[in-house]
Amino acid sequence: MIIDVNTPIPFRLDKYLKRLYPSLTQGVIEKALRQKQVTVNFQKAEANLRVKEGDTIFINDYFNLPVTQHETLVFADAEIKLAKKILTDYLIYEDDHLIAINKPASLATQGGSKINLSIDSALKYLNYQGADFKLVHRLDKETSGLLLIAKNYLSSVKLHDAFKEKLVIKKYFAITYGRPVKNVGIVKSNIGKSKGRMFKITDIDSDNGKLAITYYKLLKSLNNNLFLIEFMPVTGRMHQLRLHAQLLGCPILGDDKYGNKEVMPYSKYMFLHANNIYLSESIVGKEIKLEAKLPFYFTRRLT
């Protein structure tokens, strides 16, 4: 059998074969590759070879199974383009367990009633092509920086549990309007729902909301009452850093939800960036330290 690869996104050969023959085990696929029962472009191929559009897979009668016909799904051009960027322009790190990307601001992590394009919708396209990507945490649409994506179910469980047990160390850079009273400190509060998609600070002993904890450190004084602050959230509540910055009296520049528009200078962007993530060896079997480059508008404000 001759199969012309039709995926524009490069994928591992074993994953591509698994999509064509769902009933086959990984062991059977690898044995077929070792015995040259499956070749790519007339060459012996390893399981981790990435096949792409234009490649040709030759399969002997070894499998003796019909190729599975998948339901045809239609994806928007924007989703396909974003999928390619996730694996190229945005990609910071990749191993067998996960990929890490530098998400730009204005791009949603997940879709919604008014959101047609998101990281999640692009992952659905990649998964349709044979991948098994899964989101394990999220960033606000307006927040840029590091976003981890699991490459399979088992890794997604490990990473999700690590976030839940507060084993993932995250650091954010923010430019704020105003400064906190203390240069270094910790913020503790409850965060509960408010009107619409807004959240609010509630009393620490209140039944409304969940406990939120953030460490912070003032890093640099900038011009026009602007300051660079490092935030390290212990918990991961919705809009936590934005609300805690507001509570400290120094809202994040460009935050149109929790900033004071009448006082704070106008900004097209919100200056909150997920800069660092640290995973200990106990999470995925090795220590991982990641850093995401600041966007151009952020570095421009720092000079």
Swiss-Prot record:
It catalyses: uridine(955/2504/2580) in 23S rRNA = pseudouridine(955/2504/2580) in 23S rRNA. It holds the Pfam family S4. It comes from the Bacteria. The keyword Transferase does not apply. GO terms for biological process: enzyme-directed rRNA pseudouridine synthesis. InterPro entries: PsdUridine_synth_cat_dom_sf, PsdUridine_synth_RluA-like_CS, PsdUridine_synth_RsuA/RluA, RluA_PseudoU_synthase, S4_RNA-bd, S4_RNA-bd_sf. One of its GO terms (molecular function) is RNA binding. Its EC number is 5.4.99.24. Residues 11-70 form the S4 RNA-binding domain. The keyword Hydrolase does not apply. Keywords: Isomerase, RNA-binding, rRNA processing. The active site is at D140. Responsible for synthesis of pseudouridine from uracil at positions 955, 2504 and 2580 in 23S ribosomal RNA. PANTHER family: MITOCHONDRIAL RNA PSEUDOURIDINE SYNTHASE. Belongs to the pseudouridine synthase RluA family. This is Ribosomal large subunit pseudouridine synthase C. It comes from Rickettsia typhi (strain ATCC VR-144 / Wilmington). The gene is rluC.
